[in-house]
A protein has these predicted regions:
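Conserved catalytic cores of very large enzyme subunits
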Residues: 1-120, 124-624
Length: 624
């Protein structure tokens, strides 16, 4: 590869595009202007190889890119394009992996040969004996996964993994260098958008005795993430009403910097749902997450939790443009038409799930200690996970139909159908009326909560009996990265959303209401194990407000955990700052924002994502 091209590609998002045929160049429409090379020219310089871990490890050029005293190597010239789908988007159990004694299989011998080629005393296959050697061992195994084409590689519960090692005087420096080393290949590791690496570290959590686990490593990781101030890796704090408030305060101080970490997950709610889904208690209490927030069992599961989207908003649009809509004589008739569209969507999803063929994976199977390959059903849990988009659009559209058509009789069904088909053109009053949603999704309205729960329950009936070819089940959740991309391909809905506009992000309501209102809404949603695949409350908070009220927000969050929220993430930002950053990017090279389940530099985002965040911040701050 030409040296100048390689240098450009190291800092551009072309490698992630190559890793999956699902990527599109639409996101990179400004690629030539931004990176000084056309995608076609850049593609010519890349050698794509099939998935063959021993071959890749033999071929890979070794060059240390680690920070401080750590060794870390990834060869940029190797991009893996598998025949089938590589299993990824999950952590391994690094406590098991770093203590693994290798045997004499092909994959084990290839790992030993790779380590021998590294030829560095820091990198061994011996069991770690202290913090430094444990972190180095994690980095080695982590790099093997990335090098062989696995994406969205999580880190698991590192405070628990490292608990056995005494904390040395230089622990903070070591952990900071460890995090920086993981970040050093930020672009190479990114998925659809720059920053979407899946490098998530879990901290804290309930144990099987109902006691809350945390230690000095828990606090150190939070302090170090705040100190290095990078968008990646990211943290998820497993929370409980039994957790110490000072740990929540420390987490709020970290979030106040704007880096979007940690995300919060409520063990008091999540763990019982996972047991209800079918996990053994010991696995439920030791749960991890996929790349963003989707719960799974660490180290013994196939669980791929981002395989499809239930498209509530798109189903609602289909109802609104259906010629038979005007035949409905009651609200229940309309609701049943919606359910029929939803059932059709679920059938399409299940058909798609059945078509997936997984790539045989001797490396991942080894790292899980499986007797048969994970791609052939060798894991303890072989479940799937799907996400969903547009629940707020569906709920608010249905509530508007109920109120304005069947209760107040201001419109007929033909009237609202025309408004949607016309995309609110010349209907400013209608747009204003349907956009209000004063008692809609995200509020404490009993009607909105009841309707949301009905739709959740109905969705569960469509999926609860599904079994994949390994006998695994499927769970869904009310969060998804698809709120913008799917919205771009969906017509108008009757909540004031116009054709092509984004859907609401996860469980959110950007109208400036108190944080407690949206928390109370989510805490009243009736999830089961089938609907436990990430239900993230996404809140926008003015940066100045959080910085000046860390203790108060910690109290709010503890109350939310006690009331029963599922998960929560914070985007701490300022409308004025975002507008200025878009106009003058050179002034804000380090401005970090939260996207769907990851953080990224604002300047790295495509324009439509910048605009979406700006619009959300504008609504949140009540700016006209």
């Amino acid at each position: 590869m030409k040296k100048e091209i390689k240098k450009l590609l190291k800092n551009s998002p072309l490698y992630p595009f190559l890793r999956s045929t699902k990527r599109t160049l639409r996101i990179y429409k400004e690629y030539p202007q931004k990176y000084g090379v056309s995608p076609i020219e850049a593609l010519k310089e890349i050698e794509v190889c099939k998935y063959d871990a021993p071959y890749i490890l033999k071929k890979a050029t070794i060059k240390n890119q680690g920070i401080g005293d750590f060794f870390y190597s990834l060869d940029h010239s190797i991009v893996v394009e598998p025949k089938n789908t590589i299993i990824h988007n999950m952590p391994v159990d690094y406590d098991y992996v770093t203590n693994l004694e290798l045997g004499d299989s092909v994959i084990e011998n290839s790992i030993k040969a790779y380590v021998k080629r590294i030829n560095d005393p820091r990198v061994t296959l011996e069991k770690p004996h202290d913090l430094k050697s444990a972190l180095q061992s994690i980095l080695l195994w982590n790099s093997l996964l990335w090098q062989t084409g696995h994406n969205l590689v999580g880190l698991g519960r590192l405070d628990k993994v490292l608990a056995k090692y005494p904390i040395p005087e230089d622990a903070e420096e070591l952990i900071c260098d460890f995090l920086k080393t993981l970040h050093c290949e930020y672009t190479f590791k990114s998925g659809v958008l720059k920053g979407d690496t899946g490098q998530i570290i879990l901290l804290g959590g309930l144990d099987e005795n109902g006691e809350y686990f945390c230690n000095e490593y828990t606090k150190l990781f939070i302090k170090c993430i705040e100190k290095i101030h990078l968008p990646d890796p990211k943290l998820l704090l497993r929370c409980s009403k039994n957790m110490p408030k000072e740990l929540m305060e420390l987490s709020m101080e970290c979030n106040a910097t704007g880096i979007g970490s940690p995300l919060f997950s409520n063990d008091d709610i999540v763990i019982p749902k996972l047991i209800d889904f079918g996990y053994e208690a010991k696995d439920a209490y030791n749960y991890g997450v996929s790349a963003c927030w989707e719960p799974l069992s660490i180290g013994n599961s196939l669980e791929q939790n981002n395989l499809a989207n239930v498209e509530y908003g798109s189903c609602m649009h289909q109802v609104l443009v259906d010629e038979k809509l005007s035949d409905c004589s009651t609200f229940d008739d309309v609701l049943n038409v919606f359910y029929k569209k939803l059932e059709g969507n679920s059938i399409q999803i299940k058909t798609g799930l059945d078509r997936i063929v997984w790539e045989d994976d001797p490396l991942l199977s080894l790292m899980m200690g499986l007797k048969s390959d994970i791609a052939q059903g060798g894991a303890k849990y072989n479940d799937y996970g799907i996400l969903s988009v547009g629940m707020s659009a569906a709920v608010n559209s249905l509530l508007n139909i109920k109120k304005f058509v069947f209760e107040e009789h201001k419109y007929t069904l033909k009237d609202v159908q025309k408004i949607v088909l016309d995309n609110y053109q010349d209907s400013a009053d209608d747009f204003s009326l349907f956009s209000e949603n004063a008692n809609g999704y995200g509020t404490e309205s009993d009607e909105a909560i009841s309707l949301t729960n009905k739709i959740i329950s109905k969705t569960e009936t469509f999926f609860k009996d599904y079994r994949n070819k390994f006998g695994g089940k499927v769970k869904f959740g009310l969060s998804s990265p698809g709120y913008l991309m799917i919205g771009q391909n969906c017509g108008a809905t009757l909540d004031g959303r116009k054709a092509g506009e984004a859907f609401q992000t996860h469980i959110s309501r950007d109208k400036g209401e108190p944080l407690t209102e949206i928390m109370n809404f989510e805490s009243k949603l009736k999830f089961t194990g089938t609907s436990a695949n990430a239900n993230v409350l996404d809140v926008m908070v003015p940066s100045s407000l959080l910085k000046d009220n860390v203790d108060k927000f910690a109290t709010y969050m503890m109350a939310g955990i006690k009331s029963g929220i599922f998960q929560l993430q914070m985007n701490v930002l300022s409308y004025a700052q975002l507008v200025d950053a878009k106009a003058h990017p050179e002034k804000y090279p380090n401005l970090i924002v939260r996207v769907w389940g990851f953080s990224a530099y604002f300047n790295d985002l495509p324009e439509e994502y910048k605009d979406h965040l700006i619009n959300r911040a504008k609504q949140m701050e009540h700016i006209n």
